[in-house]
Amino acid sequence: MKVRILTLFPEMFNGPFGTSILKKAQEKELIDIQCFNIRDFALNKHKKVDDYPFGGGAGMVMTPQPIFDCHHHVTQMLNLNEPCKTIYLSPKGSTFTQEKAMELAKEEQLIFLCGHYEGIDQRIIDELVTDEISIGDYVLTGGELPAMVIVDAITRLIPGVLSTEASYEDESFHCGLLEYPHYTRPRAFNGLEVPSVLLSGNHKDIDMWRRKQSIELTFERRPDLLKGLQLKKNEAQWVAELSKKKE
Ligand SMILES: CC(C)(C)c1cccc(C(=O)NCC2(NC(=O)c3cccc4nocc34)CCCC2)c1
């Protein structure tokens, strides 16, 4: 997969993309991530990339020309015969989910456009953006961190990026439930023990315990995730008992 990121702050990406799994994925050529500084494409003498909003109001808006020319340069270099999926990170976008990550992980190339200030000129969105995606409802300073989140979520889904055992952490493995509690050595830490079932070696009991923990945790903290799930009879019984307790 080729990922191209259009941003005013390419240096922000050095940490996350220069570390651990994302770094290794690039070294293994499973993903090719390149950042482009929109400011390099500004034609005005002072390399200005923002201007006052027509109609007045607080804040500044990113001007269309540098973004348009940067996007044109990137699409030329990708040398495609059809327009490239161009994702604008935006609070107005559809909320990013694991399902969306799995959908995007199938793409051959993706362009991410990161806004700044109050946002970008609408004409860019109308002409170049194919998808607007949001990572959640809070105010941020720019679209860069959302772009990193989405690239992280997508990259780990590319075959070969995660070692086989790690890839079982996928939603399909837990089928959308919150994860059971994790424990590792030592068996006693500050006088705190590990649940004995996990030390029993009885994998049927362990799997049952973990499944019950996941269902109870999901019921308590994210009942919305439970709604869409197919539970076995005994599991549905657990949920019914939890609901009764809650009444
Ligand atoms: C209702 C609520 C969501 C709180 C809201 C209303 C109005 C503005 C803002 C706001 O944050 N504007 C600033 C910018 N925000 C984001 O880019 C951004 C923010 C959040 C999630 C995201 N996922 O991708 C990009 C995201 C837009 C231009 C530069 C940064 C947020």
UniProtKB/Swiss-Prot annotation:
GO terms for cellular component: cytosol. One of its GO terms (molecular function) is tRNA (guanine(37)-N1)-methyltransferase activity. One of its GO terms (biological process) is tRNA N1-guanine methylation. Its main location: cytoplasm. Keywords: Cytoplasm, Methyltransferase, S-adenosyl-L-methionine, Transferase, tRNA processing. Its EC number is 2.1.1.228. S-adenosyl-L-methionine binds at G115, I135, G136, D137, Y138, V139, L140. It catalyses: guanosine(37) in tRNA + S-adenosyl-L-methionine = N(1)-methylguanosine(37) in tRNA + S-adenosyl-L-homocysteine + H(+). InterPro entries: Alpha/beta_knot_MTases (IPR029028), tRNA_m1G_MeTrfase_C_sf (IPR023148), tRNA_m1G_MeTrfase_TrmD (IPR002649), tRNA_m1G_MTases_N (IPR029026), tRNA_MeTrfase_TRMD/TRM10 (IPR016009). Signal peptide: none annotated. It comes from the Bacteria. It is found in: Cytoplasm. Belongs to the RNA methyltransferase TrmD family. NCBIfam families: PRK00026.1, trmD. Homodimer. Specifically methylates guanosine-37 in various tRNAs. This is tRNA (guanine-N(1)-)-methyltransferase.
